[in-house]
């Protein structure tokens, strides 16, 4: 399927995002499965009022999988699936005491996890675990890298990055 995104009259730029329904379904099942395993509520947020096709597809797939595959189990466990816009989710998360899983698309999760970790303590106290639908786990540094020091290093400037500083 082809669709015109924008007809430029002059210089400009387009940002494109893609995903497959199969991949979104896999992500949704991993989230719902993790919520069941940990017996925690699952919150999911997008910005489907702006991204009417891409984000709305995520919202619809999550809802369909919840309704058809997980609703009864959630009710049995006394846990809840909750969808809201990401800006509403941010406000709710900041006011909350935690105890739930917040499922986000990749970019949203990357940014929001840093925000939450900083708001409630320190990036060094945060974990980052990627869980595949088949149960494979990948652990990574949650706090990212020191990009500005790397760019200084490339210019031949001295840096003072102290990796031990993140250890408590």
Annotate each language-model stretch with its function.
Residues 17, 48, 89, 155-159:
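Residues at structural and domain junctions
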Residues 3-84:
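Glycine-rich phosphate/diphosphate-binding loop of Rossmann-like nucleotide-binding domains
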Residues 55-102, 106, 111, 135-137, ...:
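Active-site rim loops that border cofactor/substrate pockets in soluble metabolic enzymes
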Residues 93-168:
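Glycine-rich phosphate/nucleotide-binding loop
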Residues 1, 13, 107, 111:
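N-terminal glycine-rich phosphate/adenylate-binding segment common to multiple enzyme folds
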